[in-house]
Amino acid sequence: VITASTAHIEQDECGAAERFIGSKVLTVETNNGKITTDMVKKHLHGFDFEHHSQPKVVSITQVTEMGTVYSPSEISEIAGFVHGYDMFLHMDGARIANAAAALDMPFRDFTTEAGVDILSFGGTKNGMMYGEAICFLRPGLSADFKYIRKQSMQLASKMRYISAQFIAYFRNDLWLKNATHSNNMAQALLKKISAIQGVLINQEVESNGIFFSIPKEVAEELRKSYFFYPWNEEISEYRLMTSWDTKDSDIEGFTKLLSEMMSSS
């Protein structure tokens, strides 16, 4: 499996991908979370050579871990490339609703139509209580999945309660309202923190994530009042995520405190 060095399956799953499917995860370095065909190409060697792991899947994340969004053309280019090597394209869509809202287009336009073979369709990060849907977009790929699901202990005894959430999620475009709100809140937050002297914005804000650098001592004090993750401690970089239930008052309170701390640091 070839993926970005920032991908969730590489960084945040405790080695689950390698343990449970028995496949090597190979990574490519990327500054903005996106991978390109040139990045993938360096791992495409050793085919039919028993001493080398055999490349079979490229996994991309939409929205990426860096908050950036792939365009349909970028995805199509990757899909066409990997299919030429008889490989599959997987999309981690934990924040796929935010991507659809940002691109202002249906899911199909940047998944099925763009050549994605397997999609993990997320809802937990956009208001659902829990659960993901696995979508097989190429005929035949799901043939043995029900056995894999059972063996990997992913068949819940009341699976219908997980599935039922998607009915409400899609009804009246609730998913889109939630994702649009989340993205809009990120832009509002970006506007305010960008105006604070000493705050450095490190990535384009294309969805609901903001990556910024502030002095470590300021961040440590700020985290006593607001929860957010450190991202790259070497450059004192931190990640802010807005969500479906972020309020204007949350942004006002956070930026007011940050401004006060930066002024006195």
Question: In which residue ranges do the predicted regions lie?
Answer:
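Conserved PLP-enzyme active-site core in the AAT-like
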Residues: 1-203, 207-213, 217-221, 225, ...
